[in-house]
């Protein structure tokens, strides 16, 4: 599997890792906790081809750096992909992110492996359509960009969940790079960070 990510800056990364450690210490059988802090733009079963790197390089170098803002916590209850409740930090609505996702996915979908667009877990027609077309269920306006903390089962009434939802947060994150990762189970291996075009307005 290949993941295309936005990585958090230092301040945001510290906050995400603080919560990851807190949840990991408190609960067993958590999911996604060991994953490096990131926001997923695209995640799909792509053929392991060096051409992907060249395509990404060409695509990303045309994208100008930009800012994202994170002002609230979010929980995806009964997450179809994890079977638990997934704790996240929501990224404020940003049309630039949707444009970037569209650009990247359009270029990479030709590298999708055969039969990588099937899913037995999804029932939502919007997610199924996206999965069939792109090999990832969250491409388009229904995508909710976020940074994940972790996913936990049957703990939504815990003090930790309550504290997380009550957190007052305010982060601004400069996005100067987009990174590509190889993912095997819970193991994430950085392939390359691609620098975005300098934006004089940033």
Predicted regions span which residues?
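Extracellular glycan/ECM-engagement signal in secreted proteins
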Residues: 177
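Interaction-mediating elements
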Residues: 101, 180-183
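Detector for glycine-centered tight turns/loop "hinges" at secondary-structure junctions
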Residues: 185-187
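Short, basic/glycine-rich phosphate-binding loops at helix/coil junctions
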Residues: 80-84
């Amino acid at each position: 599997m290949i993941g295309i990510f936005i990585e958090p800056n230092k301040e945001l990364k510290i906050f995400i890792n603080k919560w990851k450690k807190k949840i990991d210490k408190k609960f067993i059988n958590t999911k996604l906790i060991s994953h490096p802090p990131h926001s997923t733009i695209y995640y799909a079963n792509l053929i392991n081809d060096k051409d992907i790197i060249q395509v990404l390089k060409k695509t990303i170098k045309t994208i100008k750096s930009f800012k994202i803002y994170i002002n609230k916590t979010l929980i995806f209850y009964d997450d179809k992909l994890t079977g638990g409740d997934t704790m996240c930090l929501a990224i404020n609505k940003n049309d630039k992110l949707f444009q970037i996702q569209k650009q990247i996915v359009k270029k990479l979908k030709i590298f999708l492996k055969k039969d990588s667009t099937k899913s037995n877990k999804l029932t939502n027609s919007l997610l199924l359509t996206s999965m069939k077309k792109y090999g990832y269920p969250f491409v388009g306006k229904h995508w909710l960009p976020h940074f994940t903390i972790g996913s936990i089962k049957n703990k939504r009434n815990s003090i930790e969940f309550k504290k997380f939802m009550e957190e007052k947060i305010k982060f601004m994150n400069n996005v100067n790079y987009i990174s590509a990762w190889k993912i095997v189970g819970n193991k994430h291996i950085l392939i390359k960070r691609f620098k975005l075009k300098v934006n004089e307005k940033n």
